[in-house]
Amino acid sequence: MEQMSGELHAASLLYMRRLMKCLGMLPFGQNLFSKGFCYVLLFVSLGFSSYWRFSFDYEFDYDFLNDRFSSTIDLSNFVALVLGHAIIVLELLWGNCSKDVDRQLQAIHSQIKLQLGTSNSTDRVRRYCNWIYGSLIIRWLIFIVVTIYSNRALTINATYSELVFLARFSEFTLYCAVILFIYQELIVGGSNVLDELYRTRYEMWSIRRLSLQKLAKLQAIHNSLWQAIRCLECYFQLSLITLLMKFFIDTSALPYWLYLSRVEHTRVAVQHYVATVECIKLLEIVVPCYLCTRCDAMQRKFLSMFYTVTTDRRSSQLNAALRSLNLQLSQEKYKFSAGGMVDINTEMLGKFFFGMISYIVICIQFSINFRAKKMSNEQMSQNITSTSAPI
């Protein structure tokens, strides 16, 4: 049973754990030295980044002394970077319950195979996760290439933290893919149970009872899946809402920096960097929202399968089992919330885009007003100087 339950983890999150260990987000072992190394790496990276940032020994793309609005946005981006990196790593080191989540999901997968007669293959979830891994590696490489190409000290200094953000959010995307796979297997198992109920509707009660017992097993498996999702929420309780806020700040500010770089006529490499990072982060947000919406659709499909059963509805035992199952399915709906503040789905994605676009328009409008006021003040000062000059 332990070997069977390990198949799901090997097909999905095994390589992500190794990547996170290589990045210093997770310790290589459970001993004190391994955890201490992660703490030292975190504080050294954030300390060096903060010290170098506030030394101001680098080039600005805006008027740092006079453009208060741009400097405020710049400082907000840096604070979000440092706090987000610290929250993600500290949450992983202090409250890492990933083994509990993996154990629950693997146990559910084994129960579906053994009790509901589904296939023993994990090829589908492996294919889903390979797509996510491939996307992560490609985005990492593109991000590193455009960072080197732009050759700006500010972007190079933030590279390690940005890689940590992408890895943590991709871990959440992998879990969404695993849950989608389990829902698909659960629907196949539910169809097998319904087919068995139809085939045995004229059989003896002893045979019929075995089929009805599978409804109770199906109900227990769904309850275990619902509890595993709640445990997964606890695993991402702080980091997920932090990542969403960080990505919202970045995706809203990056178009503003693109606009400002075109106005200030900075290097084209900087504009390419800003546009590329914007696309990378938008893609990172879209995929898990789509997967969560698919899981919700699978949940509704699973409910409709048993809500519309018409086979042998004169049986009081079958009616009682179906009522109990439908009541549970209507209450234990699929819903993944980020820190209890927002549900992850395409509806949230639409609100995210609307807020992002609104924030971009506001930032650009502030910049236009600031530049117009600055030009007006300069022109006024020139006029005063010219009129006060001696004749």
UniProtKB/Swiss-Prot annotation:
Record-level Gene Ontology MF annotations: ligand-gated monoatomic ion channel activity
GO-annotated cellular components: axon; dendrite; membrane; neuronal cell body; plasma membrane
Species per Swiss-Prot/TrEMBL record: Drosophila melanogaster
Family per similarity comment: Belongs to the insect chemoreceptor superfamily. Gustatory receptor (GR) family. Gr2a subfamily.
Gene symbol of the encoding locus: Gr98a
Keyword set includes Plastid: no
Pfam families, sorted: 7tm_7
TM segment ranges: 32-52, 75-95, 129-149, 174-194, 240-260, 273-293, 348-368
Name the record gives this protein: Putative gustatory receptor 98a
GO biological process terms on file: chemosensory behavior; male courtship behavior; monoatomic ion transmembrane transport; sensory perception of taste; signal transduction
